């Protein structure tokens, strides 16, 4: 939690919003650095490698890095951006798929989906995704992430 102290409540809100945006951008960049860096390293290795078996392994790692990057960007777009269309509700299966992909990318995390509604309010989906990300980060040794929501 970030606390910004100011006697001017307007300035405090502006500073807090700016600090929050900076922290969010730092988090997104941090989360994307690993798979994008692995992709760059794989391309460099692929350019110098001549052994067909090693080149095949490089291609598999490149595909894995691209998939992880894509999954994270889709997750971030809905969790922090304006994704989900123009409606007020988002199909719950979209959030379920993003959380499952996030857990799969981290490895050793199983997910259980306990949301009965076919759609959820867009703000609720954003909160659900953020809580799921925090919980997945806390499962450093693996485990089961149970995701639920009710009205």
Predicted regions and their residues:
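Glycine-/small-residue-rich active-site loops that bind phosphorylated ligands and cofactors
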Residues: 87, 119-120
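Short acidic helix/loop segment immediately C-terminal to the autophosphorylated histidine
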Residues: 47-53
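An N-terminal amphipathic alpha-helical segment
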Residues: 93, 97-98, 102, 140-151
């Amino acid at each position: 939690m970030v606390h910004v102290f100011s006697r001017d409540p307007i300035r405090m809100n502006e500073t807090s919003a700016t600090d929050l945006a900076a922290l969010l951008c730092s988090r997104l960049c941090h989360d994307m650095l690993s798979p994008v860096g692995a992709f760059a390293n794989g391309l460099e290795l692929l350019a110098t490698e001549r052994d067909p078996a090693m080149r095949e392994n490089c291609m598999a790692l490149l595909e894995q890095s691209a998939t992880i990057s894509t999954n994270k960007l889709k997750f971030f777009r809905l969790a922090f951006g304006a994704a989900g269309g123009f409606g007020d509700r988002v199909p719950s299966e979209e959030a379920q798929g993003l959380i499952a992909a996030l857990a799969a990318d981290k490895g050793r995390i199983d997910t259980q989906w306990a949301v009965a509604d076919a759609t959820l309010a867009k703000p609720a989906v954003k909160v659900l995704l953020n809580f799921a990300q925090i919980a997945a980060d806390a499962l450093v040794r693996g485990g089961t992430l149970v995701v639920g929501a009710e009205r």
